[in-house]
From Swiss-Prot:
The gene is fhs. The lineage of its organism: Archaea, Methanobacteriati, Methanobacteriota, Stenosarchaea group, Halobacteria. NCBIfam families: PRK13505.1 (NF010030). This is Formate--tetrahydrofolate ligase. InterPro entries: Formate_THF_ligase (IPR000559), Formate_THF_ligase_CS (IPR020628), P-loop_NTPase (IPR027417). It is an enzyme of class 6 (ligase). Belongs to the formate--tetrahydrofolate ligase family. Keywords: ATP-binding, Ligase, Nucleotide-binding, One-carbon metabolism, Plasmid. Its EC number is 6.3.4.3. The keyword RNA-binding does not apply. GO terms for molecular function: ATP binding; formate-tetrahydrofolate ligase activity. Pfam families: FTHFS. It catalyses: (6S)-5,6,7,8-tetrahydrofolate + formate + ATP = (6R)-10-formyltetrahydrofolate + ADP + phosphate. ATP binds at residues 56-63.
Length: 553
């Protein structure tokens, strides 16, 4: 690795522009961010979004593709930056293990990034729990806000998968232990503060967004905000450094901004807007990713992030894999990787319905689509070629085999050339979002459910319709909607593979993320606090007497 100050100097960042965390990691200071935003006006600002088909639980290589494509664009003579989310400890120790790409397309220093990195997640956890503590102090010590303890919407947060904390009771310590009430924990990445951080333009905007977060409702049903409990200043203070984007490097020496990490199944699922705007001032291409399949991350990127950040994508890379196609073709739930390994090209072809639905969905936004077939070691030439032929001949979209995991930029030239062609042919006037701001909340939900997920209709259960009425009363009806849905299926039933038909999307709750500026519509299968599997990835991790880590990725 190259010292970070030397690596980024040709990209417009000097020694005084960085706040250092060792030799290979830094944050970009505010004055440099502002300068780069101005410089972006003289750059091409080609925005390339990487998304994917509905993945297996192990993932199909979106981050590998994002990193590999960024490296390859530089390899073929372009100037490209990379922006990705930073990992959460929960998934790192849970199912997926370490996350920052892999093989010859990874971001370094991998161990630091996956563990504590620059402390952004810790800062968010502290700020979130400070708000929770100040809220409970207000409730138990002279509540002049008349807070309804049965209508507190702000939980606690922890950056660890722990199902035992999904439902808790607090205040059981007697007279000095606070007011007893039901409570819960969420993963830090699921906190509204994470979404706020990633949508804020600067520290001033961050503070304003934090102030309007709704933490509870009073006995009259009116919202109680962070500002009402006087937590705006101290909470934002804890995030003073967290809003600065982190800059590191890929294994081939391309600068990468790794910042923020909201989940795409319960939030908007992309890295921070600050990172994106900074990257636009450093290169002519920005390659970024959206979480999970395109039904979740990409839809939210188009309808929420581009709306909030005034951005227009020039190309979308849809990551597919032989493994994921077999997963759908064999109609598996739960996944059986041994059966996938034994299946042949017939299973691949049987899974095309899922890939096709994702490709058609993306075309609705008016952005050129390039399918990237991320090749795994066990894939046969026949299987990969079947996917490429189907994309080119049946779907009529660009497609390329990607070997960036094994070969780095040498394995991504065909993909990069297709992406360059797509961006050159793109017309920003063709870009369109699925719905307008002034569409009703139910219209927005119905549009996403039918156009993207393939549902026939939407069914509202529990108090969801009352929630929508309340959102209208609070003048939140012009907010975009973030659909909180399982990532295991295009539908709201994780067991349904391919492109399910003849079903209704069930919405159980709608609530505001007033600081982030969107509404969240919950389906029946969405968890804000995941649990560890019977044998988590953590069980295979270790550290020796010299401090060398093994099993992290």
């Amino acid at each position: 690795m190259e010292p970070i100050w030397e690596l980024v100097e040709p990209w417009g960042l000097g020694l005084d522009d960085l706040q250092y965390f060792g030799e290979y990691t830094a944050k970009v200071k505010q004055h440099a961010i502002e300068r780069l935003r101005e410089q972006a006006e003289n750059r091409e600002q080609n925005l390339v979004l990487v998304t994917g088909m509905t993945p297996t639980p192990k993932g199909e290589g979106k981050t590998v593709t994002t990193v590999g494509l960024g490296q390859t664009l530089n390899h073929v003579g372009e100037e490209a930056m990379i922006a990705i989310r930073e990992p959460s400890l929960g998934p790192v120790f849970g199912v997926k293990g370490g996350a920052a790409g892999g093989g010859r397309s990874q971001v370094l220093p991998m161990e630091d990034i996956n563990l504590h990195f620059t402390g952004d997640l810790h800062a968010l956890t502290s700020a979130h729990n400070l708000i929770a503590a100040m809220l409970d102090a207000k409730i138990s010590q002279g509540d002049d806000l008349n807070i309804d303890i049965n209508n507190v919407s702000w939980p606690r947060a922890i950056d660890m998968n722990d199902r035992a904390l999904r439902e808790t009771v607090v205040g059981l310590g007697g007279k000095t232990g606070g007011t007893p009430r039901e409570d819960s924990f969420i993963l830090t990445a699921a906190s509204e503060l994470m979404a706020v951080l990633c949508l804020a333009s600067d520290i001033g905007d961050l503070k304003e967004r934090v102030s309007r977060i709704i933490v509870a409702y009073d006995e009259d049903g009116d919202p109680v905000t962070v500002e009402d409990i006087e937590a705006t200043g101290p909470a934002t203070m804890l995030l003073r450094d967290a809003i600065k984007p982190n800059v590191v490097q890929t294994i081939e020496g391309t600068p990468a901004l790794v910042h923020g990490g909201p989940f795409a199944n319960i939030a908007h699922g992309t890295n921070s807007l600050v990172a994106d705007k900074t990257a636009f001032g450093m290169g002519d291409y920005l390659v970024t990713e959206a979480g999970f399949g395109s039904d979740l991350g990409a839809e939210k990127f188009m309808d929420v992030v581009c709306r909030k950040g005034d951005m227009t994508p020039n190309a979308v890379v849809l990551v597919a894999s032989v493994r994921a196609l077999k997963y759908h073709g064999l109609n598996q739930w739960p996944v059986d990787y041994d059966e996938i390994g034994e299946a042949g090209v017939e299973a691949v072809e049987a899974g095309f319905s899922n890939l096709d639905k994702h490709a058609r969905n993306l075309q609705k936004f008016g952005v050129p689509v390039v399918v990237s077939v991320n090749r795994f070691p066990d894939d046969t030439d026949e299987e990969v070629q079947a996917v490429l032929d189907h994309c080119r001949e049946d779907l009529g979209v660009r497609a390329a085999e990607s070997n960036v995991f094994s070969d780095g930029s040498e394995g991504g030239v065909d993909l990069a050339e297709n992406v360059i062609e797509a961006t050159e042919e793109s017309n920003e006037e063709d870009f369109r979002m699925l719905y307008d701001d002034d569409d009703s909340i139910k219209e927005k939900i119905h549009t996403v459910a039918t156009e993207i997920y393939g549902a026939d209709d939407v069914k509202y259960t529990g108090g969801a319709l009352d929630d929508i009425e309340q959102m209208n009363d609070l003048d939140f009806d012009d907010y975009p909607v973030v659909m909180s849905k399982t990532f295991h299926s295009l539908s709201d039933d994780a067991s349904q593979k391919g492109a399910p038909e003849g079903w209704e999307l069930e919405i159980s709750e709608v609530y505001p993320s007033a600081g982030a500026g969107f509404l969240v519509a919950l389906t029946a299968d969405a968890l804000t606090m995941p649990g560890l599997p019977a044998r988590p990835a953590a069980a295979d991790m270790d550290i020796d007497g010299d401090g060398n880590i093994s099993g992290l990725f």
